[in-house]
């Protein structure tokens, strides 16, 4: 977050993308395991930096009317990349998929060159750093109307007032703390509801439900992984096309409710002793859960988070959300086996159902509908002390 705030969104975004591509090449051509491991660590750092900078950058340069669509492009592209990697056999040198890998790398570096030549710096970061003329110039190039650009810059300058930034703003401003705690609560409960654990345990659940030896085969588990990622990709595409048209609140509420319903169904099915029927229903319910959870996570992580965090604390707040998300994922992966051994899948499903029910309640009572509202207006309403659910324009509760 410090790099994104100090060096700017553009440099961080391009630099992390270049670093990630370079580390990917090193991973493929690594001569030893130590080099391979180091390149994976570098790739992880680059991915985190790219995620942080790209989400902030997208929210700061796009118009309110298409901000959600543009923000959802990142998770959709991420899932598509994983799909290509999983469905393409052997990306190592000499493998069947190696030519495709080289083609994707060349496209990536071509996109980097275009980004270096054409991508402007975020006008919000320029205004926050004191480069007002440059911010106006960038806004004019983006909006093609000087009056709109000047009006937008006036709103940005209003949000730039104040000495507190980042962690200092978090410690001194109650309204900023409220929105950060809301976002962290949503992150915690979406992960506790099993968005990572349920696909991860898909094959184990099938093995427990059916006693066929086919379920122990690696190819079957791999097919389940492919199915899970494909469904998640469809969820990201659904979020992309609904988050601006229907708003943030409605897709998040519906997807959270579907998650809770499917988990409740899994709780009931887990007590069933009809193996074949249970296996079919469990598969359908898990697919529904992955789809709806993907919609929720895209609307939340890619769109809502950067919209509601104020400009002077955007990097800090976004970094906090991503950090808690990663830590919660690691804790869930670490502890889920102990939960299954102690409480069986029945206990796991029950815990996830409770978490999903709490997630529905938080979403209904606190999540605002921020589509068609500028991020400066959202910030002004936040600092004016308005209820969190009413931060968006024209929201009734």
State where each predicted segment sits.
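Alpha-helical transmembrane bundle of multi-pass membrane proteins
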Residues: 1-133, 137-140, 160-397
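Generic detection of long, well-ordered alpha-helical segments
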Residues: 129-132, 146, 150
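Short helix/loop segments within enzyme catalytic domains
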Residues: 142-144
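Short, well-structured alpha-helical segments
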Residues: 149-160
């Amino acid at each position: 977050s410090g790099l994104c705030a100090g060096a700017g969104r553009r440099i961080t975004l391009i630099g992390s993308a270049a670093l990630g591509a370079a580390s990917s090449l090193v991973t493929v051509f690594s001569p030893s395991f130590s080099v391979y491991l180091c390149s994976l660590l570098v790739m992880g750092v680059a991915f985190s930096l790219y995620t942080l900078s790209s989400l902030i950058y997208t929210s700061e340069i796009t118009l309110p009317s298409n901000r959600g669509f543009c923000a959802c492009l990142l998770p959709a592209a991420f899932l598509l990349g994983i799909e290509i990697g999983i469905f393409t056999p052997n990306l190592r040198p000499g493998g069947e998929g190696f030519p495709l890998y080289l083609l994707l790398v060349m496209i990536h570096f071509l996109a980097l060159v275009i980004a270096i030549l054409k991508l402007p710096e975020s006008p919000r970061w320029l205004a926050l750093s004191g480069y007002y003329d440059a911010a106006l110039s960038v806004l004019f190039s983006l909006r093609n109307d000087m009056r709109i650009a000047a009006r937008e810059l006036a709103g940005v300058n209003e949000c730039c007032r104040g000495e507190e930034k980042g962690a200092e703003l978090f410690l001194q401003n109650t309204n900023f703390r409220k929105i950060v705690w809301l976002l962290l609560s949503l992150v915690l409960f979406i992960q506790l509801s099993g968005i990572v654990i349920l696909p991860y345990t898909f094959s184990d659940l099938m093995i427990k439900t059916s006693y066929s030896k086919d379920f122990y085969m690696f190819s079957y588990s791999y097919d389940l992984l492919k199915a899970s990622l494909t469904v998640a990709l469809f969820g990201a595409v659904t979020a992309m096309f609904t988050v601006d048209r229907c708003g943030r609140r409605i897709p998040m509420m519906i997807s959270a409710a579907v998650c809770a319903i499917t988990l409740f169904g899994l709780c009931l099915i887990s007590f069933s002793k009809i193996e074949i029927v249970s296996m079919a229903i469990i598969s359908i319910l898990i697919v529904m859960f992955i789809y709806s959870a993907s919609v929720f996570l895209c609307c939340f992580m890619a769109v809502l988070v950067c919209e509601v965090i104020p400009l002077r604390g955007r990097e800090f707040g976004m970094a906090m959300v991503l950090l808690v998300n990663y830590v919660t994922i690691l804790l869930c992966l670490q502890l889920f086996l102990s939960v299954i051994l102690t409480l069986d899948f029945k206990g796991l499903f029950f815990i996830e159902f409770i978490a999903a029910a709490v997630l529905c309640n938080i979403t209904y009572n606190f999540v605002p509908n921020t589509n068609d509202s500028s991020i400066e207006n959202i910030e002004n309403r936040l600092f004016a002390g308005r209820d969190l659910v009413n931060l968006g324009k024209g929201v009734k509760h």
